From Swiss-Prot:
Domain of life: Eukaryota
Keyword Nucleotide-binding: no
Lineage: Eukaryota, Viridiplantae, Streptophyta, Embryophyta, Tracheophyta
Protein name as annotated: Pentatricopeptide repeat-containing protein At5g15010, mitochondrial
Any Pfam family the entry gives: PPR_2
UniProt source species: Arabidopsis thaliana
Amino acid sequence: MRGIFLIRSRLSIFRAPAVKCLRFSNVLPSLSNNCIVRLYMEPPVACVLPLGLCSMFSTSIADSEQVGFTRSNIEKDDESDIDLGCSISDELVSEDVGKISKLVKDCGSDRKELRNKLEECDVKPSNELVVEILSRVRNDWETAFTFFVWAGKQQGYVRSVREYHSMISILGKMRKFDTAWTLIDEMRKFSPSLVNSQTLLIMIRKYCAVHDVGKAINTFHAYKRFKLEMGIDDFQSLLSALCRYKNVSDAGHLIFCNKDKYPFDAKSFNIVLNGWCNVIGSPREAERVWMEMGNVGVKHDVVSYSSMISCYSKGGSLNKVLKLFDRMKKECIEPDRKVYNAVVHALAKASFVSEARNLMKTMEEEKGIEPNVVTYNSLIKPLCKARKTEEAKQVFDEMLEKGLFPTIRTYHAFMRILRTGEEVFELLAKMRKMGCEPTVETYIMLIRKLCRWRDFDNVLLLWDEMKEKTVGPDLSSYIVMIHGLFLNGKIEEAYGYYKEMKDKGMRPNENVEDMIQSWFSGKQYAEQRITDSKGEVNKGAIVKKSEREKNFLQQPEVRKVVREHGYSFWDE
């Protein structure tokens, strides 16, 4: 009761008049000229793979910015490497995109047939066309690379940085790092100015995604080889990539190792702090970094508070959220929209919905910060999780009245309370009517849900719809599909999707690989045992028959007698 009383007493500040506070200004320290500490050797940049041979694909043995790292942000970051902003205004280009897309679909996984049909088609590639096709086939690296190489050989077409970056990102995502470095080397030979910091940042992100921290740092050192400057922004991009893919501890280590070259800076610490808060979700480690900032003389700013409040909000520590919120005001740091959104989420999660609504009014009327879609999502999501469907719908209607359009996250919250396959497809139809197309993540969520319900007919419908209306299933989609089918006894079907995934060059995680291989080994062993046992039975029957024939003259005739109803009969 005392805890609730303290929380409610703190909530009263939301109705109090606003206190005039000075905004905290963050001054970056001057850069030092000392060299960065070298922890690893530089990577080999130039590779000798013949790029012109489409059939030769190499495999690697290694497997001012806002910091908010959620799954959706990671996906957006991946997609930003692949140019998706290509609006096809030219009717001829749009027609050519349709032709190439049909070719790709008809050829399936037959790369040789695809190469032959591309050579026979009358399509002339352009920069716009290549970017669009690479975007559509980005989950099938062999198809993408086959098309990319074919386009590069056509007269009148010269690759730009956009196409190179898209292809490098696709290769890096599928761990074809050697081939990606070959493309970078080709860019350098064609024109040294083509290789920029964004090119190497794509490689850094892909190495971080597979947790190869050493090669990510090596690639950062390769900036000098390409005559690129290694400024504080580039260093913070490295930290951001490391934290985005859960290499947060390594990022924190780099800050201290390179303090002479890159002095302690609030933004650098905020990247690591946010990694512990929103990627790893470890309040203990986040508090350690928070204390380290104070120990080295780096002041906490609004981003620091936003990360910590978000961390406590997700963990359900409402009391700590309100303490930090009070502390911000005492230190004259004005909360921004992100802070308010996190506090709204914490209040709604703790069932203080009316207080959350009051805070939304306060931020709009007294602070002049209008609630956005994220603010309403922060309220809708915990309501849906608590099965308060009617209240969630009221908030949804209120959001529409304010002229805000729901995002994919809004609909994902409502998907958690669906109960039948019919409701799933009804919600998908409403999404499209509102102009919000489902993403691959949407289909993954629904496929997982329908597999739990053992509604496999609708699972297959969703899978086909995903293949038709999105860029196609990615690795995560296949893993969810294989798990859902396998754990529900649809083992042969799961194995079919496993083979399809392997044919596309995707690497499953160890759990899926072990699960399928164990079943496949057991299946082969069982089939072999059945074959062997049948052979032994047939062999034994032949031996017994031959022995009877051989000893027929030496043995007396033996006939069996059966008894039935008190009478004896010869056994026929």
